[in-house]
A protein has these predicted regions:
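Metal-ion/cofactor- or nucleotide/acyl-coenzyme-handling active-site neighborhoods
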Residues: 1-159
Length: 159
């Protein structure tokens, strides 16, 4: 199965060799070093960058030489922001999450450490569960338990 658009979250964009169209994070201050590392890896440039405003304000004062768009966020980690960008700004009808398990043991991609905060970020996902279930599937962890895996039938179904 081919995907129309690929969005990467946070530091995964450094290591993803695919031609991605959008890079999304809570941490816009890291776009510049991440982009340099991606370039050093010889991967294609990513043309669009997104960061969130959290509860109405920028998460941090961020100065970056890389221009990025913003989207309002109620929280839920960078994984939720990527869902919001895909659905609300890009009009995605179906979203497949890869590497967004939202579990303590799933850790964070670039640290290799347990992610104790994972449980705290789930509240937004839980509040939006019924809505998200209509168009989100996941390959791993708690998000897979909540939304199911993407089947070929689901991927190829209309809507």
């Amino acid at each position: 199965t081919e995907f129309d658009t690929i969005l990467v979250v946070g530091s995964t964009g450094v290591d993803c060799p695919l031609p991605c169209q959008h890079w999304v994070t809570f941490h816009a201050e890291l776009f510049e070093p991440w982009t340099l590392k991606r370039r050093e890896n010889g991967y294609p440039e990513i043309p669009n960058y997104w960061a969130s405003t959290y509860m109405g304000g920028l998460r941090r004062v961020t100065r970056s030489r890389i221009a990025y768009d913003t989207i309002f966020s109620e929280g839920g980690s960078s994984g939720m922001i990527v869902v919001q960008v895909a659905r609300e700004r890009l009009g995605a009808q179906k979203i497949v999450l890869a590497g967004v398990p939202m579990t303590i043991e799933g850790g964070q991609y670039d640290t290799g450490r347990l992610w104790a905060e994972a449980l705290a970020y789930r509240d937004v996902w839980e509040r939006k569960r019924d809505y998200l279930k209509t168009f989100v599937r996941s390959l791993s962890g708690w998000t897979r338990e909540q939304f199911g895996e993407p089947t070929l039938e689901w991927l190829h179904a209309e809507g």
